[in-house]
Regions:
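C-terminal substrate-binding/active-site "lid" region of AdoMet-derived donor-dependent transferases
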Residues: 197
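A polyanion-binding, active-site-adjacent surface
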Residues: 2, 7, 14-160, 167-170, ...
Length: 226
């Protein structure tokens, strides 16, 4: 696994010494050696690499990495730029962005532009076996990503959480900082998007909150890739 070298390291360093993380590390190492696992090992911590803790403005919490090839690269909901097929949940996110902020729907699902602006695109589980959804659940990633969420909660500045669906919303008891804004909606998957994700206007609400606190809003428009 790639090393964490930015300001996330002091925030999560204690986790590496805990028994659960040693077991998790051994499990993940063995999985990569004997089967196909996504994302590529060097991309596991991309959410942290691309969005330093000191720059987090928004946290969008996903669950499991995409489990088909050429999709997962360490950012929740995002797929690699050469992947022309946009996953259904991300298609619905783009539809909501179009309705909410007038964003044009792009021809790709590569969300690094958001990460570079301070949107932490975090999954609660950071690896998965190819074609086996949820195959690395319950192995320790949840405890590690809880430590990441707790580090964000401890930041003494305005931050927005977008929590879509019950698994993401199960983290709400951890979010105790009165300076932070929690936005809740159903998951954008085709199974639940029409139950309240469409029309939630989370993106404009987040930008309004950031602007009210003197923070540069997010440019949510993802550009086309030729």
């Amino acid at each position: 696994m790639a090393m964490i070298t930015n300001d996330w390291l002091p925030a999560v360093r204690e986790e590496f010494a805990k028994p659960y993380y040693r077991q998790l590390y051994q499990f993940v190492k063995e999985e990569y050696s004997r089967t196909v696992v996504y994302p590529p090992a060097e991309d596991i911590f991309n959410a942290l690499h691309f969005t330093p803790l000191s720059e987090v403005k928004v946290l969008i919490l996903g669950q499991d990495p995409y489990h088909n090839e050429h999709q997962a690269h360490g950012l929740s909901f995002s797929v690699l730029p050469d992947q022309k097929e946009i996953p259904p949940s991300l298609q619905n996110i783009y539809k909501e962005l179009q309705d909410d902020l007038g964003c044009k729907i792009p021809n790709n699902g590569y969300l690094k532009k958001w990460a570079d602006q301070g949107v932490l695109l975090l999954n609660t589980v950071l690896t998965v076996r190819a074609h086996q959804a949820n195959s690395h659940q319950g192995r320790g990633w949840e405890q590690f990503t809880d430590a990441i969420i707790q580090a964000v909660n401890a930041q003494d500045r305005p931050i927005v959480y977008m929590l879509w669906g019950r698994p993401a919303q199960s983290k709400i008891p951890m979010l105790t900082n009165p300076k932070h804004l929690i936005l809740k909606a159903p998951h954008p998957s085709p199974l639940s998007a029409y139950r309240g994700f469409f029309g939630c206007r989370h993106f404009s609400q987040a930008n309004q909150f950031l602007k009210e606190h003197g923070i540069e809003p997010i440019d949510w428009q993802i550009e086309n890739i030729n």
